[in-house]
Amino acid sequence: MIESTIISQLEEASAVLSNFIEQEKKQNSIAKAADVITSSLKQGGKIISCGNGGSSCDAMHFAEELTGRYRENRKAIPAISISDPSHMSCVANDYGYKFVFSRYLEALGNKGDVLLAISTSGNSENVLEAVKEAKNKGMFVVALTGKDGGKLLPLADVCINVPHVGYADRIQEVHIKIIHTLILLIEQSLL
């Protein structure tokens, strides 16, 4: 019983990744996203990332791999995850959770920066508000989504969508591979 569960889970994860790879061969969205991000960084911009739950962890992981290190030693790359508990609780209490990311961008987002918006459904209200604010500020938007891309799909400059309609964990597993690939491409472009 345990062995069959383990094998079925790994096979399902492999199938979701394989399906995404076939789509990516046609769309080339990861390369487009890396190009948008590196162009911004080369012009003095920064990357601000956001998401909810596991996607928040992915947003933090992305930022720390850039400000810290991924595989090799290199200069720090400007990236911030919107995850400060004081900011989040203040804005959620005073304005509503819908605005926790957009208020941060209102304060710290600049024209030419990049917002990495992560939502497995593509419909997270606070992420959509962040995208609206990013667009108002003249920022570029790269989105990581799942399912059909949701409302986020048409709003992003580049949307990397994992077309899986099952549980979000499978989408998140592919998102972390995408994040690591983006970081590798960013490093290769900047070094």
Swiss-Prot record:
Substrate binds at residues 52-54, 65, 93-94, 119-121, 124, 172. Keywords: Carbohydrate metabolism, Cytoplasm, Isomerase, Metal-binding, Zinc. One of its GO terms (cellular component) is cytoplasm. Zn(2+) binds at residues 61, 65, 172, 180. Binds 1 zinc ion per subunit. Pathway: Carbohydrate biosynthesis; D-glycero-D-manno-heptose 7-phosphate biosynthesis; D-glycero-alpha-D-manno-heptose 7-phosphate and D-glycero-beta-D-manno-heptose 7-phosphate from sedoheptulose 7-phosphate: step 1/1. CDD domains: SIS_GmhA (cd05006). GO terms for molecular function: carbohydrate derivative binding; D-sedoheptulose 7-phosphate isomerase activity; zinc ion binding. Residues 37-191 form the SIS domain. It comes from the Bacteria. Its cofactor is Zn(2+). It catalyses: 2 D-sedoheptulose 7-phosphate = D-glycero-alpha-D-manno-heptose 7-phosphate + D-glycero-beta-D-manno-heptose 7-phosphate. GO terms for biological process: carbohydrate metabolic process; D-glycero-D-manno-heptose 7-phosphate biosynthetic process. It is found in: Cytoplasm. Its EC number is 5.3.1.28. Catalyzes the isomerization of sedoheptulose 7-phosphate in D-glycero-D-manno-heptose 7-phosphate. The reaction produces a racemic mixture of D-glycero-alpha-D-manno-heptose 7-phosphate and D-glycero-beta-D-manno-heptose 7-phosphate. Belongs to the SIS family. GmhA subfamily. HAMAP family: GmhA. This is Phosphoheptose isomerase. It comes from Cytophaga hutchinsonii (strain ATCC 33406 / DSM 1761 / CIP 103989 / NBRC 15051 / NCIMB 9469 / D465).
